């Protein structure tokens, strides 16, 4: 077991000798509204509107050369990250997106698939990305090294960005909550208000980080066409 501060991120806790923490990754599937109702509710209309806006934005970033249905996996990743980030804000629910095990296992295969597709089908186009336009001849070899390194670390930055933001917010909430027993009743009111404001901020961060993860994945995939 980790220290008390990081115990909320401990995936080794179990129930009846079964590690059930990672099952929280799929809790969002239970909350996805049905799309086949005869009369859709307001939530369904809002959900469909959000998906349509994401689809149009991703198609714009991918360009005209993208394949039909290429935005499906990107929207699916956004929805998965969004639900898991929000689920982690509820008490006693394991935050799977705060672990590099999940974020890196999604970012790395996706980045590898983009690279394999680009280098196999558009080799010359991929080589042009290694040397930016207008680079002096003396700096070309150096720019190739820099662009290669920046390309290789992309899956790591995707994974670390999401996990670090989730960990930071939960740690702040934990630290504020641990100070509660030592405070007086009058000061406790300010603590509760502060935690409510921080929870609203964390809700916004949960949505923003899911969007950033999916939009950066879209930008990376648009470079291989």
Curated annotation (Swiss-Prot):
The protein's location, in the record's own words, is: Mitochondrion inner membrane
GO CC terms of this entry? mitochondrial inner membrane; proton-transporting ATP synthase complex
Topology relative to the lipid bilayer, per the entry, is: Multi-pass membrane protein
A Pfam family per the record: ATP-synt_A
The UniProt keywords, alphabetically, are: ATP synthesis, CF(0), Hydrogen ion transport, Ion transport, Membrane, Mitochondrion, Mitochondrion inner membrane, Transmembrane, Transmembrane helix, Transport
Q: Does the keyword Iron-sulfur apply?
A: no
Give the transmembrane ranges: 18-38, 73-93, 100-120, 126-146, 156-176, 187-207
Q: What is its main location?
A: mitochondrion
Cite the InterPro entries for this sequence. Answer: ATP_synth_F0_asu, ATP_synth_F0_asu_AS, ATP_synth_F0_asu_bact/mt, F0_ATP_A_sf
Q: Which GO terms describe its molecular function?
A: proton-transporting ATP synthase activity, rotational mechanism
The answer to whether UniProt assigns keyword Signal to this entry is no
Q: Which domain of life is it from?
A: Eukaryota
Where is the signal peptide, in residue numbers? Answer: none
Q: Which CDD domains match?
A: ATP-synt_Fo_a_6
Q: Which family does it belong to?
A: Belongs to the ATPase A chain family.
Oligomeric state and partners? F-type ATPases have 2 components, CF(1) - the catalytic core - and CF(0) - the membrane proton channel. CF(1) has five subunits: alpha(3), beta(3), gamma(1), delta(1), epsilon(1). CF(0) has three main subunits: a, b and c.
Role description: Mitochondrial membrane ATP synthase (F(1)F(0) ATP synthase or Complex V) produces ATP from ADP in the presence of a proton gradient across the membrane which is generated by electron transport complexes of the respiratory chain. F-type ATPases consist of two structural domains, F(1) - containing the extramembraneous catalytic core and F(0) - containing the membrane proton channel, linked together by a central stalk and a peripheral stalk. During catalysis, ATP synthesis in the catalytic domain of F(1) is coupled via a rotary mechanism of the central stalk subunits to proton translocation.
Q: Which PANTHER family match?
A: ATP SYNTHASE SUBUNIT A
Q: What is this protein called?
A: ATP synthase subunit a
Q: Which gene encodes it?
A: ATP6
